[in-house]
Amino acid sequence: MEIINSDEINWTELFLNNEFIVVNYQPSLDCIGCKEINDLFEELSLEKKYSKVKFLWVDSRNNPIAEQFIKKRQTPFIAVFKEGFLVECDNISNETGLREMLERLFAFKFKL
């Protein structure tokens, strides 16, 4: 998993070069409930099934929008994108929830 500061992200380039993106917004790497998701991101990023998925951790303290989500909800806060569009976002704190979210991401079809 790539750990980056949201100030260092070129979001346009990221979305243009990656079909599937999963972002874990959290205030630190050791927040309550975050360690399990961080470890799971690492594991999933190595699985062949998820080889086309870009997994990122973004420090929510440097991202005003993410910070507002987290104030109203809990961490870890996961957002999934397909071809640059937000498909789903929610609090996910276990393997089953994250794998189900990824399956919905893969199955998502744009409506014209």
Q: What annotation goes with each model-predicted range?
A:
Residues M1-I21, G97-L112:
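N-terminal leader/targeting and pre-domain segments
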